[in-house]
């Protein structure tokens, strides 16, 4: 067997194989012999079918088995010989399998690009300046107040208004045919929240518990699901409950419900501290993102489409999980899988580029993650979650993928820290970013 490698691009290689005629013929004989033992043709006992009939009736099976066997025998050896580490499954193109003739086939795979990262020191980035502000604290207090609110049934005979809640069953249809993602049961909706298609919530203002109503809407032309965009839809809605929200007073008694506080002022002080921590983390994430974008701007690289697709699939899965927790779906957000991937493809590609470039910097600068780094992170995680350190450590020791992801995250953090230490960072107000 001989194999040669052709670079089709910085991330794609084509391996061409030629298997000698003698080896091909021997494999054909072996495979036909195996098929003959189990071949079933009317008029012959199993295993007693004449060879000529086996070859006549099982030609395609033979070719498939021979190709698979010769592929397994040659492909992985060639990867090792040529030091190729694919990130994708191979795309196979093959000649017809014939006795007495050499077999030529090719395997095209995607690989990691070879990156000579440059201009990663002295990156110029802006960092938002933290400014203390009471408004976010007041907003958080109102959120907590909303969270402690009670939903009580509307007075009998009273109609639901904007700001009230309704619990509904609904089934949506276009031209009388129900569509995917257009139905739910016992869905709680705040009227006026804008969570549904324009016009849907407005038509439920004035309903009463027990009422049935037909809601007519038209999906926006720019709606993410192309099958529904611009189409008129009808929703059969049953109102199971109508509720009004009652908010508690903001006072010391309210603060005491959150455990460690005796006064409202103590609660406000704690919220201010938490807000500062959150803003510091947000600003850090933002400047890290800017560092990565600057790094990408200085290093034009090609990335394997396979890695972009994997990143997109992970983003899609995460989005679906978040929506499911809110009893929502992509369709309710005006998207489907394809429109989501189209919308976020550039973002996914940038994330892949960033990861590969950060890894290249780590390799060039000898930045690594050691056991003390991992232990320190696990201790911080255990403390934050209020869990026993040994229990957290055991979990990661027993879950290889989880630990691998943790180490990768720590490595990126180290590299980003290095880049920031060597960057030209200018602090500016938020509106100057």
From Swiss-Prot:
- Broad class of enzyme this protein falls into: isomerase
Q: Does the keyword Protease apply?
A: no
* Localisation per UniProt entry: Cytoplasm
EC no. given is 5.2.1.8
Q: Which GO terms describe its molecular function?
A: peptidyl-prolyl cis-trans isomerase activity; protein folding chaperone; ribosome binding
Q: Which domain of life is it from?
A: Bacteria
SUPFAM superfamilies according to UniProt: FKBP-like (SSF54534), Triger factor/SurA peptide-binding domain-like (SSF109998), Trigger factor ribosome-binding domain (SSF102735)
Q: Which GO terms describe its biological process?
A: 'de novo' cotranslational protein folding; cell division; chaperone-mediated protein folding; protein transport; protein unfolding
- PPIase FKBP-type domain residues are 163-248
- Keywords, alphabetical: Cell cycle, Cell division, Chaperone, Cytoplasm, Isomerase, Rotamase
Q: Which GO terms describe its cellular component?
A: cytoplasm
Catalyzed chemical reaction(s): [protein]-peptidylproline (omega=180) = [protein]-peptidylproline (omega=0)
Instruction: Write down the InterPro entries for this protein, in alphabetical order.
Output: PPIase_dom_sf, PPIase_FKBP_dom, Trig_fac, Trigger_fac_C, Trigger_fac_C_sf, Trigger_fac_ribosome-bd_bac, Trigger_fac_ribosome-bd_sf, Trigger_fact/SurA_dom_sf
UniProt keyword Chaperone, yes or no: yes
Which family is this sequence assigned to? Belongs to the FKBP-type PPIase family. Tig subfamily.
For domains, the record's comment is: Consists of 3 domains; the N-terminus binds the ribosome, the middle domain has PPIase activity, while the C-terminus has intrinsic chaperone activity on its own.
Q: What does this protein do?
A: Involved in protein export. Acts as a chaperone by maintaining the newly synthesized protein in an open conformation. Functions as a peptidyl-prolyl cis-trans isomerase.
Q: What is this protein called?
A: Trigger factor
Native organism: Geobacter metallireducens (strain ATCC 53774 / DSM 7210 / GS-15)
Q: What is the lineage of its organism?
A: Bacteria, Pseudomonadati, Thermodesulfobacteriota, Desulfuromonadia, Geobacterales
